[in-house]
């Protein structure tokens, strides 16, 4: 936890608003890619970015920045995972626009998920269940629970990295963009729900209640 986070109490964001902040940039990306030619005709400045995928990338970067700023204004904190993901969006998005090569933005999920997976699984090698630092405010688990949950999420992130590589290398750009919204997100939600039995089994709050 940074000194800024420690100095000011965290303000909880409603689950619905949190979902909007997380899904908003992805929805902008999907809409801009599917309506890129229309946007280019309506807003000549966007046409300067290039084709639909480049317009979508530029607006995705702007929407990501807006979501991070909104999160900071409301909570005075920036969650680690959205922050890291945002930084990668800005770097790879800038490369995409500068070089006019959509490979960079397509590889962004691969880089982010590989990074998260490697950090989580690597932390276990040093006896650290780093996932606990991310979700500790949401729920409390015993040491074994955090270890198992960290392993599962670490492997899941690596799975998403491989899946992204398969999708963008094997299918069209439009399919890849749609899969980011309508494929990856439902898979992640289902995986999260599947962890509830583990969380309930190792919950310290449940133990204290008993």
Swiss-Prot record:
| Membrane-spanning segments | 12-32, 53-73, 78-98, 115-135, 148-168, 175-195
Q: Which chain positions lie within coiled-coil regions?
A: none
Record's keyword annotation contains Transmembrane helix:
yes
Q: Which UniProt keywords apply?
A: Cell inner membrane, Cell membrane, Membrane, Transmembrane, Transmembrane helix
Q: Does the keyword Disulfide bond apply?
A: no
Membrane topology annotation: Multi-pass membrane protein
Localization recorded for this chain is: Cell inner membrane
User: What cellular component terms from Gene Ontology apply here?
Assistant: plasma membrane
Q: What is its main location?
A: membrane
Q: What's the superkingdom here? A: Bacteria
Annotated PANTHER family = INNER MEMBRANE-SPANNING PROTEIN YCIB, INTRACELLULAR SEPTATION PROTEIN A-RELATED
Its job: Plays a role in cell envelope biogenesis, maintenance of cell envelope integrity and membrane homeostasis.
NCBIfam families attached to this UniProt entry: ispZ, PRK00259.1-1
Q: Which family does it belong to?
A: Belongs to the YciB family.
Q: What name does the UniProt record give this protein?
A: Inner membrane-spanning protein YciB
Q: What is the organism of origin for this protein?
A: Rhizobium meliloti (strain 1021) (Ensifer meliloti)
Tell me what gene encodes this. Answer: yciB
């Amino acid at each position: 936890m940074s000194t800024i986070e420690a100095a000011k109490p965290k303000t909880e964001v409603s689950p619905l608003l949190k979902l909007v902040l997380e899904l908003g940039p992805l929805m902008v990306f999907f809409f801009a890619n599917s309506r890129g030619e229309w946007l280019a005709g309506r807003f000549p400045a966007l046409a300067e970015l290039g084709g639909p995928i480049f317009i979508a990338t530029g607006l995705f970067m702007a929407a990501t920045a807006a979501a991070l700023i909104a999160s900071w204004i409301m909570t005075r904190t920036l969650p680690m995972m959205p922050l890291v993901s945002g930084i990668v969006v800005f770097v790879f998005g800038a490369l995409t626009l500068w070089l006019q090569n959509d490979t960079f933005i397509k590889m962004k999920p691969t880089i982010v998920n590989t990074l998260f997976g490697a950090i989580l699984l690597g932390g276990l090698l040093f006896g650290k269940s780093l996932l606990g630092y991310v979700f500790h405010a949401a729920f409390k688990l015993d040491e074994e629970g955090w270890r198992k949950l960290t392993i599962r999420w670490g492997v899941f992130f690596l799975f998403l990295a491989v899946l992204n590589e398969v999708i963008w290398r094997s299918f069209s750009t439009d399919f890849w963009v749609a899969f980011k919204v309508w494929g990856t997100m439902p898979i992640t939600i289902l995986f999260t729900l599947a962890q509830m039995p583990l969380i309930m089994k190792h919950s310290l709050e449940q133990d204290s209640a008993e």
